[in-house]
């Protein structure tokens, strides 16, 4: 919650050992109300104009301002389902290949900053940070339930609440890696916060992703023009890597239920409806996991200048 405060007590770089947001991350944050840099004290983030943002007891901080109609943030049940599904390792190959590609193309700089947008529980961010020694990471998400988990996903990370429709609460050219896994994207803002040598990492589902469950469980389909729409939005970026990762795996009914419960399809069915559909599945179902992975760098001439 935003409030007025006259606090002005910045902390030293040993903040992570004291349970606070690591100082290199704080230096990249900016106030969503006035766009000035933020400082940190024992309980909150604040700017010199007196805007103050409390840190939740679980460790995350919301830098979201009011005024917009709220989106459907992930509920507690959705986050529990996602965490249970990810713990099985079903999406492990996506996590592993993504961090390999990112580590191969990330700029060589001291203490690079990684921003995972709509990062959920921090599952993918923690893998990236392990692959980039000395890096720091920010998981940005709208769901407080996801942020509670993301705040503890890695000792060099922080969890920040924000609406991706708004300007990101990050300084211009402060980010070395901007990542998006299955989530919504604000490409102009990602371009603004990226360093000139920074990279954009995007993972999106293909039309074959979980196709065996789409009809059986009434899940949402991937739009047939999804790839073309993304390409149009990335006109100011050049692709460094574009590849498809596809594999098949046998899943249980519980895993199928968690898959349907953890994403946007959960907003379009009741738990009872889902249980009835899952009950019709065999004990194990072979499903296809299929995603497009892309690494991009912005075209220098397209750099947008911001005051």
What are these regions (language model features)?
Residues 37-39, 229-244, 264-274:
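A SAM-dependent methyltransferase catalytic signature shared across enzymes that methylate proteins
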Residues 68-97:
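Class I SAM-dependent methyltransferase Rossmann-like catalytic core
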Residues 165-177:
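A short acidic, Gly/Pro-enriched loop at the edge of an enzyme's catalytic core
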Residues 187-201:
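A short glycine-rich, Lys/Arg-flanked "PGG" loop and its adjoining helix->strand segment in the class I
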